């Protein structure tokens, strides 16, 4: 049975026992939010801003010992995570942040809300991945 990448994303979160997701919707991540809609195993926390979101995930991880998990859209949504990612990383707080991205064929073409978040976070995060296409999901 084929499932969408968004459905696979939700399935992976559940398999990793993520029960709280700090998330702010936007165009390039909207399919992920549709897949999360009605999901009862994952509580989605919707803050007023991505910067608040990432710091809330950091605080959640510090207070519970669990991984703080974030989901935002591309461009400014992703860029707004940088300070919180750096804070968590420098204090060895476990955090995983997912961002949307423009369509693969538009990467590098200065398209609307495109930000090279992989390069931006190289100095402040342990690992960065840009998933292109369905085959890479199967390798993870």
What residue ranges belong to the model's regions?
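N-terminal alpha/beta PP-like core and its mobile active-site loop of ThDP/TPP-dependent enzymes
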Residues: 1-140
